[in-house]
Amino acid sequence: MHNTFTHTKNNTHTKNNTQAKNSGSQTKSNAVSLNKPRKLTEADVTPESIFYQRRKVLQALGITAATLALPASAQADLLAWFKGNEPPKAPSGKPLTFTPSAAYHPDLALTPEDKVTGYNNFYEFGLDKADPAANAGTLKTEDWQIKIDGDVVKPMTLDMDYLMKCFPLEERIYRLRCVEAWSMVVPWIGFELGKLLKLAEPTSNARYVAFQTLYAPDQMPGQKNRFIGGGLDYPYVEGLRLDEAMHPLAFMVVGVYGKTLPPQNGAPLRLMTPWKYGFKSIKSIVHIRLTRDQPPTTWNLSAPNEYGFYANVNPHVDHPRWSQATERVIGSGGILDVKRQPTLLFNGYAEQVASLYRGLDLRKNF
């Protein structure tokens, strides 16, 4: 027997009785030639299933019969999306009190704030990079709660007020590397994921941590309409091994650039694992579950030959349709101001995390 604790906004606790994974080395393989990558097209950098979903939408809008064949609700969603009907504007972020960390790349040049908040992948709000900023104002973050359960001694439900008071916030400047071969440098504000998990006291059976994004089709148009959401199965889910989740680099983010997270960046709570491709850093988290078995993850379910469970940044293991040897740096310039740089193993965090994968073939376990 154990207890379930519910933390509410006034920090009262309601108790109810219930039943309740030195430098590592990857497996040696043939050397990989880091040839200059070919120029990428939209079809290259967009996941194949999403590219064809987008094409279908455009064709449907250009062919009346195809549009009329859609259900009435789908017609309305699509027409509203392309007519430019503006959703509610997202509220401005609130200033946060935090301590800047000197241990995490204070010397790196930051990506401009407008690029961090305006160039995003969050398919729940549309497929284009500008869609999340344009459409995420519908996301309601008031009274947000995070449920932690599974193989834990103390399952619990926590609200954001409690989390913000429970853990001292720090600012960490992390590299962000998207699987689409572009990168940013972002000043995230939050606390270590491991500290949160320790509250729930994982049992000896716990080997993995599963995460789930909010499922709210009335707020997230991509969940309501498969064309807008790229044909993915929602809610979005992700997972880590427990030792990855407990690593000090694994960070729960509540803010960016000194303020609370904007909706398009995953408000009010998201994950950041800087040594992995960006799709692992799940946004708008409502559920964390510790489990003995490896949990399913959205992109691996959608295209298992393209997106693995581990998703560690690795310049020697290409995506099936493009090179991962270099990355496009998102900076202050426009589309013609393109800077590329070599991609670093584990996104530059090899010294910290390589030991997690000692003996693991990173080509097979991509």
From Swiss-Prot:
Task performed by this protein: Part of the MsrPQ system that repairs oxidized periplasmic proteins containing methionine sulfoxide residues (Met-O), using respiratory chain electrons. Thus protects these proteins from oxidative-stress damage caused by reactive species of oxygen and chlorine generated by the host defense mechanisms. MsrPQ is essential for the maintenance of envelope integrity under bleach stress, rescuing a wide series of structurally unrelated periplasmic proteins from methionine oxidation.
Alphabetical list of SUPFAM superfamilies matching this protein: Oxidoreductase molybdopterin-binding domain
Annotated segments matching region Disordered: 1-40
Species of the source: Yersinia pestis
Binding site for Mo-molybdopterin: 120, 123-124, 178, 213, 265, 270, 281-283
Record's catalysed reaction(s): L-methionyl-[protein] + a quinone + H2O = L-methionyl-(S)-S-oxide-[protein] + a quinol; L-methionyl-[protein] + a quinone + H2O = L-methionyl-(R)-S-oxide-[protein] + a quinol
Cofactors: Mo-molybdopterin
Protein name: Protein-methionine-sulfoxide reductase catalytic subunit MsrP
Low complexity biased stretches: 1-22
UniProt subcellular location: Periplasm
Keywords, comma-separated and alphabetical: Metal-binding, Molybdenum, Oxidoreductase, Periplasm, Signal
Free-text cofactor note: Binds 1 Mo-molybdopterin (Mo-MPT) cofactor per subunit.
